[in-house]
Amino acid sequence: MANVTVIGAQWGDEGKGKIVDWLASRADAVVRFQGGHNAGHTLVVGEQVYKLSLLPSGIVTGTLSIIGNGVVLDPWALKAEIEKLTGQGVEINAENFAIADNCPLILPLHRDLDGLREQAAGAGKIGTTGRGIGPAYEDKVGRRAIRVCDLAHLDALDAQLDRLCAHHDALRAGFGQPPVDRAALIEELREIAPYVLQFAQPVWKRLNTVRKAGARILFEGAQGVLLDVDHGTYPFVTSSNTVSGTAASGSGLGPAQTGFVLGIVKAYTTRVGSGPFPTELEDETGQRLGERGHEFGTVTGRKRRCGWFDAVLVRQSCAISGVTGIALTKLDVLDGFEKVKICTGYRLRGKVLDYFPSHAADQAEVEPIYEEMDGWSGTTAGARSWADLPAQAIKYIQRVQELIETPVALVSTSPEREDTILVRDPFVD
């Protein structure tokens, strides 16, 4: 049975939630494999709108939903999100939801450190969500992390807390802050532990069991390839690997099981926070894209920066992540533009580049080379077949897939699950 891995092929916010929701309705299991509660997903099912930050999108449809070991978990944010969804009528229990017992925890001290660093950085800040994601990953790599399984052994946590607090106390002192209140931290963990542990298990084992039974598994990526800690616009990146290869290491299944890689691509480009953005439009056109696309973050509410489609960046993302096909989203936002542009290359100090350079100084200086196309006056909103699309919109889609050297598998024409043009079904072998 075919599996599917969904990743964002830009800077996140590509519309993954709707696509994952559509795929999740046909999957037997949905797995989050990286990131934390810093990446928002908005799902629209009928008249109901669900906003998720941590839980896999499959939870809304009752599909087995799993948080893998590659995620960093804020247990208090988890509880709040579950309570919000159950209030909307979503049933969540140990049968349809599981957390990897080796998943690292985000603690209050991580949120503290995140905020202190951003505040101290001033104009040079990265633009994190301030939710402790980065510091939690640092402690994981530094072998200081407290993990979900540790919640069952809080009385044996002294040595781990010694290492963790020694590290954070030194950092906090540098910011003029008092040491970590260990007693308060232990008490908070003791209170939340039973809630989290009811869902904890070796999820690699459960995934292996459902895989052997022929289940369709959907691996749900967060953010986007251009925010990958290795391949993104460093240092303006997230703290995890967002490429498709992480689906294996972040879930406990081998790379051969990750299946069809579906890259989610917005028909234009957006970015939240600081960092290079070659096609950014700081004019009326950029404002029009933002207003029509409702470009505000699900988690932070921050206004997104907007610009024309960058084929160079998306081609690079697709190559790095081994994308099999893309889902092109929010095409309807371009409806009514007399002309539309696509970035096909860059100029940098007299040279033409067909890739995005690695150094921050070069990234900041590249100038986009545009190809201009006629726009379309008709609407693409709600289209469910090629026959519903204006001819020029079809030409735009064809040009996008030519330039990114990756075929279009489906086109999304509204937030509604049914408003999708299917070219190739990712779940079909």
UniProtKB/Swiss-Prot annotation:
Binds 1 Mg(2+) ion per subunit. Mg(2+) binds at residues 13, 40. Homodimer. Its cofactor is Mg(2+). The active site is at residues 13, 41. Pfam families: Adenylsucc_synt (PF00709). GO terms for molecular function: adenylosuccinate synthase activity; GTP binding; magnesium ion binding. It comes from Novosphingobium aromaticivorans (strain ATCC 700278 / DSM 12444 / CCUG 56034 / CIP 105152 / NBRC 16084 / F199). Pathway: Purine metabolism; AMP biosynthesis via de novo pathway; AMP from IMP: step 1/2. It is an enzyme of class 6 (ligase). This is Adenylosuccinate synthetase. Its main location: cytoplasm. Substrate binds at residues 298-304. One of its GO terms (biological process) is IMP metabolic process. GO terms for cellular component: cytoplasm.
